[in-house]
Amino acid sequence: MTHEKSCGAIVYRRYHGNIEILLIKHINSGHWSFPKGHVEEGETEVETAQREIKEETGIDVIIDPTFRETVQYFPRKDTQKVVVYFIAKAKNYDFFPQEEEIAEIKWVDIGHATTVLTYENDKSIVNKAKKAIRD
């Protein structure tokens, strides 16, 4: 069994009195999710999340390590993948998609994010993040 680990975050901003989160659409599969990527040797989970968000979107973030949610799934029969998600406040709002991987990026009102997200695991995490961001 192969084990893979990725880290990412629900990136948010406060915009005109609302909370919006950043969603990305992947080129290969066409699914909507959060920015994330594989942990590189010597990196912490937080460092991985920051690097991947910057690479995929061009946005710098402040990670809140007190919010840490994990998702586990099997992308292939012999592979278990664990994804660690944090919440992260955007320091800048203009995005620049990583053209090799990202088809589209958009800011979405957190209350409507579950209608855009593809996977149920992501919808569950955004509901938990919603509470953490508002508290």
Predicted regions and their residues:
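Conserved N-terminal beta-strand and adjoining loop/helix that marks the start
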Residues: 1-20
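Short, acidic/hydrophobic/Gly-rich beta-strand patch recurrent on exposed beta strands
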Residues: 22-25
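Short small-residue beta-strand/loop micro-motif enriched in glycine and branched aliphatics
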Residues: 31-34
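Unchanged
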Residues: 37-128
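Generic C-terminal helix-cap and adjacent flexible tail
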Residues: 131-135
